[in-house]
């Protein structure tokens, strides 16, 4: 598993999802070994329900061991995403 894994939960008609995607994509570009997995909540409804995803966008940040270290509903900024990544690297 990557040192930091970002999961982005989106939907097709979610305006803020574009902002969230841009912020997370920039963070992945800046963090060596980071990865991004995007989930469409319509096509992956079971996973969204299992992880208690209630709104889009939702960003989940996981450490290298797979533990969730941060979750945010809404569109985060790049500095917020980088701060969350720092938590994942410390975990």
Give the positions of each predicted feature:
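Local sequence-structure signature of Cys/Sec-based thiol-disulfide redox active-site neighborhoods
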Residues: 1-31
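Thiol-based oxidoreductase modules, predominantly thioredoxin-like and allied folds used
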Residues: 9, 32-46
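Short alpha-helical
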Residues: 15, 43-46, 76-79
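Short, well-ordered secondary-structure micro-motifs
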Residues: 19, 47-50
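Hydrophobic alpha-helical membrane segments, chiefly transmembrane helices and signal peptide h-regions
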Residues: 24, 60-61
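Structural micro-motif
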Residues: 51-60
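Non-catalytic, surface beta->alpha helical segment in thiol-disulfide oxidoreductase systems
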Residues: 61-91
